[in-house]
């Protein structure tokens, strides 16, 4: 009888140990799956606003900064003002920019500006991102699409010189993106449209579908892949665009 009880106890202990091990394995598996989707550190994808380094689109409003009071000069506080165009540096184009009665920048939904985004690397030799070029990349299941182009490779968002030969989104690619229902499109120079285009068709196609365009992203240190994206433009009532802070963090899968 004692032997039977001893065997029974050992069997119960063994079952308990195996059960605890299985629970631990399941917990570890859940943690591993969770950690596999944990984003890494934040990357600042915002170009610094500085008259010495910020490119201004040809014909757009110049940028100026002025200190009204300066503690370095003996004042009791430091106080400044600045003047710049709505499309300076990293900024967001709202539908109102090219769509009559389109939403102004203060009415662009946060759901469009925050969420998963895919960064696509466009070869340095490519200036026109047309439908054929777009379809060379895996973009169709992306909620938001951002293009890293020659502008990042050449550091153009840190140069005050305006470069006309920046890479742009061709209208046929814009149509594909709009038809696919992407929530946001981003580029790494101060316009998504070809310089000197006879008509702003890329803007009209995207903004006409309510898709905000983020222009002037600083992507020099950003690699192709999937990211969490947060873009927060200034909440300016009734205007067509505004400078924004943009941050990203890589999704590790």
What are these regions (language model features)?
Residues 24-253:
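Active-/binding-site microenvironments in catalytic and ligand-binding cores
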Residues 2-12:
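Bacterial N-terminal signal peptides that target proteins for export
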